[in-house]
A protein has these predicted regions:
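Short structural boundary motif marking the start of a folded domain
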Residues: 1-4, 186-188
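Glycine-centered tight beta-turn/hairpin loop motif at sheet-sheet or coil-to-beta transitions
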Residues: 6-10, 195-198
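N-terminal interaction modules that seed assembly of large macromolecular complexes
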Residues: 9-70
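Short coil/turn segments at secondary-structure boundaries
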Residues: 39, 82-83, 159
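Charged, alpha-helical interface segments at or near domain boundaries
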Residues: 46-151
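Acidic, proline/glycine-rich low-complexity IDRs
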Residues: 119-198
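Conserved small/polar residues in nucleotide/adenosyl-binding loops
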Residues: 205-207
Length: 207
């Protein structure tokens, strides 16, 4: 994703970046702090949840971590994420990051032509996977009817948003990013903790 940030001068940055690359880009616009802070001017994609934070001051390490998470999402997952942010809102970058770890039980239905497929979509979003034996035994039409009846349903301009079994997880506490690795180059991780109990994860990368 491409974003524009402001700190003395406006600059476009392509995310996600490695920690070293992010620090380099921040120094190019005069930011030397360990935790770089900028004003988010613009997120290029119109359906990017970061649009909700345009005009606000953000921690760039949080924005970069979110970009890493979003980079691994499918197109469908991105649409569900954007729908939740648009319809319900998120107050902080911490909330947005935690939402990326809490997608279970959120669905966006845009095609009702095949009710059985709708049921399968809802089932997958709630239970993550469908074992073959369970797939043969489940009546997905009835499951869809039950889910729509018992869940929070919102009709949006681009589809029907369904909240069923969703629970926001606090994976990121605002200080230590969760143990999450998207790169195939990482071969091991070390967890370190200081006397105050704060945890950091150090990655060992194969070169």
């Amino acid at each position: 994703m491409r974003i524009k940030v402001l700190s003395g001068g406006r600059k476009s940055i392509e995310l996600p970046l490695s920690d070293a690359e992010l620090n380099f880009q921040m120094k190019r616009i005069g930011i030397e702090e360990i935790v770089p802070v900028c004003r988010l001017v613009e997120a290029s994609e119109k359906d990017n949840p970061l649009c909700k934070f345009e005009g606000q001051t953000v921690k760039m390490d949080e924005v970069n971590f979110f970009a890493k998470r979003l980079d691994c999402f499918t197109e469908y997952e991105r649409k569900v994420l954007y729908s939740y942010v648009t319809d319900y809102g998120v107050g902080t970058m911490q909330d947005l990051i935690n939402l990326t770890f809490s997608m279970k039980g959120l669905s966006l239905i845009t095609d009702f032509s095949d009710v059985e497929q709708v049921g399968k979509r809802l089932y997958l979003d709630e239970f993550i996977a469908i074992p073959e034996e369970e797939k043969q035994q489940t009546n997905f039409i009835k499951f869809a009817e039950k889910t729509f009846k018992e869940s929070r349903v919102e009709v949006l301009p681009y589809g029907v948003f369904v909240e069923h079994g969703f629970e926001m997880q606090e994976v990121y506490n605002g200080k230590t990013f969760p143990e999450y690795f998207a790169s195939d180059e990482i071969v091991a991780a070390i967890e370190v903790q200081n006397q105050a109990g704060d945890t950091e994860y150090l990655s060992l990368i194969h070169i």
